[in-house]
C-alpha cells in the first residue's frame, strides 16, 4: 500500500469472546506499527460478546496514545470480525447521534456508553474500518481471537484465586 508522505500506517486486529452470552468475556488486540507487534487482552466476569467486541476496538484505539511520536500522522486500519462494530461505527452511529442515541424504532441504543467512547476515539485518528470473516485463517484475526480467549482465561484464573 502506498501511503502519502508523512503518514504512518497502523494495522489493528480486534476480537471479542464470550463463554455464554451473557457470560465470562474477553477481548484481544493485535496492533502492528513500524515493524513492531503489540498485543493486549483483558476480560470481564459478566458481559456480552458485543460488549467485548466494542471494548477490543476501544482498547486498540486507546493504545495508539502509547505509540512513539514519529512526527507523522497515523493512518489506522482496524480489522474486526464483528459486523456489529464495523457497521455500527461506519454507518449506524451517525443516525443514532441525530436521534439522541435512539435506534430507528426509537429504542435506546444498546451499549450506548461504549459506542460514545468508540466514536470519540475514532474521530481522533484517520480510521478505516474493515470487516473480516472470523475463523477463516486470517493471521491477524486468528491472533486477536487467541488473545480474546486468553482474556476469558484470565478472568477464570482470577475467579479461581
Swiss-Prot record:
Pfam families: RNase_H (PF00075). Disulfide bonds: none annotated. Monomer. GO terms for biological process: DNA replication, removal of RNA primer. The keyword Ligase does not apply. Mg(2+) 2 binds at residues 15, 145. This is Ribonuclease H. Coiled coil: none annotated. Residues 6-153 form the RNase H type-1 domain. Its cofactor is Mg(2+). PANTHER family: RIBONUCLEASE H1. One of its GO terms (molecular function) is magnesium ion binding. NCBIfam families: PRK00203.1. Its EC number is 3.1.26.4. Endonuclease that specifically degrades the RNA of RNA-DNA hybrids. Binds 1 Mg(2+) ion per subunit. May bind a second metal ion at a regulatory site, or after substrate binding. Keywords: Cytoplasm, Endonuclease, Hydrolase, Magnesium, Metal-binding, Nuclease. It is found in: Cytoplasm. Belongs to the RNase H family. Transmembrane segments: none annotated. The keyword Magnesium applies. It comes from the Bacteria. It comes from Nitrosomonas europaea (strain ATCC 19718 / CIP 103999 / KCTC 2705 / NBRC 14298).
Amino acid at each position: 500500500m502506498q501511503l502519502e508522505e508523512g503518514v504512518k500506517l497502523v494495522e489493528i486486529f480486534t476480537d471479542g469472546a464470550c463463554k455464554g452470552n451473557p457470560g465470562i468475556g474477553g477481548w484481544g488486540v493485535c496492533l502492528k506499527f513500524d515493524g513492531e507487534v503489540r498485543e493486549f487482552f483483558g476480560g470481564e466476569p459478566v458481559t456480552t460478546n458485543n460488549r467485548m467486541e466494542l471494548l477490543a476496538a476501544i482498547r486498540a484505539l486507546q493504545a495508539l496514545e502509547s505509540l512513539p511520536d514519529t512526527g507523522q500522522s497515523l493512518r489506522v486500519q482496524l480489522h474486526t470480525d464483528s459486523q456489529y462494530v464495523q457497521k455500527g461505527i461506519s454507518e449506524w452511529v451517525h443516525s443514532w447521534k441525530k436521534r439522541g442515541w435512539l435506534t430507528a424504532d426509537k429504542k435506546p441504543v444498546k451499549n450506548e456508553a461504549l459506542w460514545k467512547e468508540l466514536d470519540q476515539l475514532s474521530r481522533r485518528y484517520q480510521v478505516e474500518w474493515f470487516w473480516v470473516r472470523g475463523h477463516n485463517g486470517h493471521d491477524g484475526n486468528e491472533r486477536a481471537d487467541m488473545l480474546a480467549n486468553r482474556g476469558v482465561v484470565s478472568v477464570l484464573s482470577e475467579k479461581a484465586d
